[in-house]
A protein has these predicted regions:
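C-terminal ends and interior cores of transmembrane alpha-helices
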Residues: 76-91, 281-293
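Intracellular juxtamembrane helix-capping segments at the cytosolic ends
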Residues: 26, 108-122, 311-324
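Cytoplasmic helix-loop-helix junction between adjacent transmembrane helices
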Residues: 98-136
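Helix-to-loop junctions at the C-terminal end of transmembrane segments
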Residues: 54-67, 257-271, 355
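Short amphipathic helix-loop junctions that connect adjacent transmembrane helices
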Residues: 25-37, 227-243, 247
Length: 389
């Protein structure tokens, strides 16, 4: 592994810790600070909205100042946002906590650029492996973040969870140190006479469309069900918080641990076949959730949900980086991310409402049309490619 990829991978671990910490704690903190019960999951959703809103700008900023400066800036911004969250909890200010979660999401929009930086640091044939390595690093963030946050939750007397976000500020500052050793690729500066295809031309390309649709709805379906799972388990079905936590931990592990083999599977079988495998795991999730809600079935369902997401998201990202030219990369990446995380944000925001208005079984059935959409777009891309060949 080259040095840049090592640095990107290590930085990804620490930069990604806000996501699992916020998923783990923001709903609980929201339930204690929120003036209205219905708003308790808003901080969690606002982090995702923050990612969606700032994704395009993150790509644009990096196109101007470069990867290294962009990641350094993001590290400082995330540290500030975590400290603001700590102050909001200390002050028992729900609305300031919501703002801090939104800002944490803004910082996370830069973190999602690490996968592109990894792909750019290796030769084309090694892109699937590089993506898998960076995605695998996220599992360490998923384990490291919540455990450190939980360990430090009582750091400040009479101010529960302030220490969790202070420790998050320390974690998000680590990449600022690591990235000083990152060496950006030296690209010869030439006068730009061609800025690449426009957005309509990019989206009309079958493989680009397949990449965007796969990534967007893989994230949307996963977020829709994952956001509702703790509420359905703990609040509606009265499972203990520890059992609910176990299910979420299994889910997060299954999202990233398969990255050990996903890169090799992509190289061997191709992107579309792994997408169909991911769809198969999503279908299994729906079937299990529809017919039974025992503790062991929740574990299996959320593991299959995580595994399906891994196959779909890494395949979608791998397809994306192969579907644009060098001069189009920031435009294509920004366009992809703003669509992916906007759709994810809508799914996450609607999860609590849909659960309260319908049922857990109905929520799972709602995902079926979007699963079919992924299949149809992938089949179309495959058929058009066969015709061209």
């Amino acid at each position: 592994m080259n040095r840049n990829l090592w640095i990107i991978t290590l930085s990804q671990i620490f930069s990604f810790t806000p996501a699992p910490i916020n998923v783990f704690l923001s709903g609980i903190i929201g339930s204690t600070l929120s003036p209205v019960k219905a708003l308790q999951t808003v901080p969690t959703s606002l982090m995702i909205v923050g990612i969606a809103v700032f994704s395009f700008f993150a790509a644009k900023i990096m196109s101007i100042i470069g990867r290294k400066a962009g990641f350094l800036l993001a590290s400082l911004f995330s540290t500030f946002s975590a400290l603001l969250a700590a102050y909001a909890i200390w002050d028992k200010n729900f609305y300031l906590f919501c703002l801090s979660c939104f800002l944490i999401g803004n910082g996370m929009s830069f973190t999602h650029q690490y996968r592109f930086a990894a792909a750019e640091s290796v030769e084309k044939e090694f892109i699937p492996k590089a993506l898998s390595i960076v995605m695998l690093a996220t599992i360490f963030a998923a384990l490291l973040g919540p455990n450190i946050a939980n360990f430090n939750k009582d750091l400040f007397d009479d101010h529960l969870y302030v220490g969790s976000y202070v420790s998050l500020a320390v974690l998000t500052f680590v990449p600022f140190i690591l990235l000083n050793f990152y060496e950006p690729q030296s690209v010869p500066r030439v006068k730009k006479t061609y800025e690449g295809r426009n957005y309509l031309q990019l989206i009309s390309q079958p493989r680009f469309l397949q990449a965007v649709v796969t990534s967007a709805f893989a994230y949307a379906i996963m977020s829709f069900l994952m956001t509702a799972t703790p509420i359905n388990m703990h609040v509606l079905e009265h499972y203990s918080l520890s059992k609910t936590g176990v299910v979420i931990q299994f889910h997060i592990i299954s999202m990233f641990l398969p990255s050990l083999i996903t890169g090799r599977l992509l190289t061997k079988f191709g992107h579309s076949k792994i997408i169909y495998a991911g769809v198969f795991f999503y279908v299994l999730t729906v079937i299990i959730c529809f017919f039974d809600t025992s503790f062991i079935n929740y574990i299996f369902a959320l593991v299959f949900l995580g595994l399906g997401w891994n196959f779909l998201y890494i395949s979608g990202t791998g397809l994306l980086v192969l579907s644009y030219n060098e001069e189009e990369k920031f435009k294509a990446q920004g366009f992809n991310d703003i669509l992916v995380f906007s759709i994810q944000a809508l799914a996450s925001l609607s999860a609590g409402y849909m659960l309260s208005m319908t049922s857990w079984k109905t929520m799972n059935l709602i995902t079926i049309p979007f699963i079919i959409l992924i299949i149809l777009v992938s089949l179309r891309a495959d058929l058009l490619e066969k015709k061209l060949n």
